[in-house]
Amino acid sequence: MIDGKTIAITRSKDDAEEFIELISKHNATPITLPTIELVSKGEKIVDEFLETIEKESPDFSVFMSSKAVTLLIDSAKSISKFEDLQLAIANTTVIAVGPKTKDALERENIKVAHMPQRYSSVGVGEVFTKLNAVGKTTII
């Protein structure tokens, strides 16, 4: 089906490897064109996250990327606010977009309550539908 075609992979270099292998295996030519780069906001992101949780008391915390989890956790650790972050997240129902994100959270002893079958924002929406989350608040 993709034999002989050229396929653009818009993931970061780290995330592109599995797609490069898969595309090459099917006799297509992969081209890596990373379109998104996550850049840490430093301690600001941790403070904003904690302030939002304190002010809004969200029912759910949704994590859409293992890299974003790592940036948030590493930033919290660097400013000695990791335990505050863990506690704040623990007071919400945690949803991870996929297995890599779930693993990143669980490595830090953050319990993931839900993970969609489809690893995308659509899948997260389906989780909310199943949970009948109408009127609930969420931090993403």
PLM regions: where:
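Conserved beta-alpha
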Residues: M1-I140
